[in-house]
Amino acid sequence: PVGAGASDLRNETLRTLLREVRFAAIKGNSSEIRFLAGEKATARGVDADQGVLVSEDNLVASARMAAELSADTGAVVIVSGRIDIVAHAQKAWAVSNGDPLMTRITGSGCMTAVVVGCCVGAAPTELPQACLCATCAMGVAGEVASENMAAVGGGTGTYRSMLLDAMSTLDGPAITCRAKVKYIL
């Protein structure tokens, strides 16, 4: 739901899609997901409102909101941010992988959505696990890219390339070893 809450056209299109399509997964930033959940949310284009970002202080409340949207839509709901939330039915997990540089490049959220789609397609009968794996994979790739960039120097262009490289060389054991997942609900 890129830019949900940012314009009337996007909002009406999203409402129509939610009525007419059964999604396996819905991924968005905190503003986008709050809008879809019917909560007051403001967005600046595709960027989340800084006042509603998921934090340790609002983690449980944010997880409940995502879990309720999941129960309403039947989809796994992924809230992306410094702390990601993956919710399905009345369960939710926090994923604390990633790197602050991910917020400084355009498209990291869209990259995550692509990884979610790939994992959902690969494991359609295990949707919560697929979405958790995708979310962890993207975060771990972000961490690896940051570590690799620190070794050679560079800026956000270098980071973007190293993020793609990290994702292309990531494997299951690396994700399992580095995943930072906490059960919330």
Q: What function would you assign to each model-found segment?
A:
Residues 2-7, 85, 102:
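Short, small-residue-enriched loops and turns at beta-alpha junctions
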Residues 104-136:
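Short, small-residue alpha-helix embedded
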Residues 7-11, 30, 59-63, 110, ...:
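Electropositive phosphate-/nucleotide-binding environments in soluble metabolic enzymes
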Residues 65-70, 127-141, 160-167:
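Short, well-structured alpha-helical segments that form the helix of a local strand-helix-strand
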Residues 95-106:
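Short pre-catalytic strand/loop immediately N-terminal to key active-site residues, enriched for Gly-Thr
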Residues 140-185:
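Charged C-terminal helix
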Residues 10-92:
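Conserved phosphate/ATP/ADP-binding segment of small-molecule kinases
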Residues 1-6, 166, 170:
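Glycine-rich nucleotide/cofactor/substrate-binding loop typically near the N-terminus or early
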